[in-house]
Curated annotation (Swiss-Prot):
Biological function: Sterol-C4-methyl oxidase; part of the third module of ergosterol biosynthesis pathway that includes the late steps of the pathway. The third module or late pathway involves the ergosterol synthesis itself through consecutive reactions that mainly occur in the endoplasmic reticulum (ER) membrane.
One Pfam family from the record: FA_hydroxylase
GO biological process: ergosterol biosynthetic process
InterPro entries: Fatty_acid_hydroxylase, Sterol_Desaturase_Related
Motif (Histidine box-3): 258-264
Subcellular location: Endoplasmic reticulum membrane
Cystine crosslinks: none
Residue ranges of the motif Histidine box-2: 174-178
Name of the molecule in the record: Methylsterol monooxygenase erg25A
Amino acid sequence: MDSLNSSYPQSAMATYSDLLDLAAQQQPHLSGLERLWWAHYAYWDNNIVATATGIITFLAHEIIYFSRCLPWIIADSLPSIFLKYKIQDQKPPPSAAEQWACTKYILLIHFVVELPLIVLFHPMMELCGLSFTIPFPDLRTLTAQIIIFFLLEDTYHYWLHRAMHWGPLYRSIHRIHHQYAAPFGLTAEYASPWETLLLGLGTIGPPLLLALMDCNVHLVTVLAWVTLRQFQAIDSHSGYDFPWSLRRILPFWGGADWHDDHHRYFWGNYSSSFRHWDVLMGTVAGPEAREKRRAEREKRQA
């Protein structure tokens, strides 16, 4: 990318098309996506490169979040088809008014809390040594790092989430998220500003940590990770469990049924993506798990 940076048109009149042509001429081995990536950063110039990162990241976040929520909004509007897959099928699906109220609040949180964090992400990633230049990382590196991100975030989320169910923290920070005992897709990021900030650190923290450890983390990997993390959060709040749900393929995956019990019983199942922390720490939610813990206590006391 440095060779391209030294020769792209510095004129403010340079268009994306001009820059794409330049990338194609000087670096024909680059993929189409890599050329688009370079043209985006070249267009904004190094003086305001943080703006380029902010635009990419925030637009990706908004498009991915609401696009992924859309199938669940449709499912909630068609109970005659999808009610049989609803986990809490005794409760009515959210009304259009509830969906809209939730959307307005989430947009407020996105612009007031998440957008400033996203703008600040570029200087943080440069400070930690996280790369945004071309070429992109290979698929093996990207996959391995995302798996590590999932494990680190899940650990952070478990202990923070469990702490937020302590009385004072629950009342001051976490109570808003539990407004809906039967969650739906949009509620994945329905939270107080403080909770949004604290849980957001669990998402951006692992990439920055690995970058500090000289693990060659790339912004493309971070965007892929954030995409998958959003998918996971939205799906776990969807309120639906299908025969083809991921947790039926990967038994250690949390899934909607796992997190739905957390909202239903207001206790336990604190992990975000996996089940192992709740199993190890004895915080599995639901009457069956509670009865099992009671029987184990009686056995130890006998």
